[in-house]
Amino acid sequence: MGELRAASNGRFLLDSIGELRRAYALADVVVIGRSFGDLHGSDMMEPAALGRCIVTGPRTEDFAATADALRAGGGLVDATRDSLAHVLAALIADPVRRAAHGRAACDVVRAQQGATVRTCALARRVIAMSEARTREHA
């Protein structure tokens, strides 16, 4: 993909894989389109990490843990097909609200950083406990 630019009206639609990060960097609001149909959402962590205001539809099953964490942290705006236009208009008209949702989303990502290290440490403890029990019963 070459240079990514918004249309003259400031809007663009992207249906692509591997190019979303560049598009998210241009966005004031990111709509997770796959969450409005039968595709069950898309990963929201990239736009969250960039501090973008994220709008999702009701179908986020494939990314439920991420959606739940973002929603609980105030970093996700829920919409339906019927409410999407109204939700977007309200967000576009309110840069303070957009920024607050974006900051909240980014805070959720920051809180999750280090999860792999914590998971490995927990796995090591579980393995050590299992080995100790095995030795006790041997």
Protein language model regions, located:
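Nucleotide-activated sugar donor-binding and catalytic core shared by glycosyltransferases
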Residues: 1-138
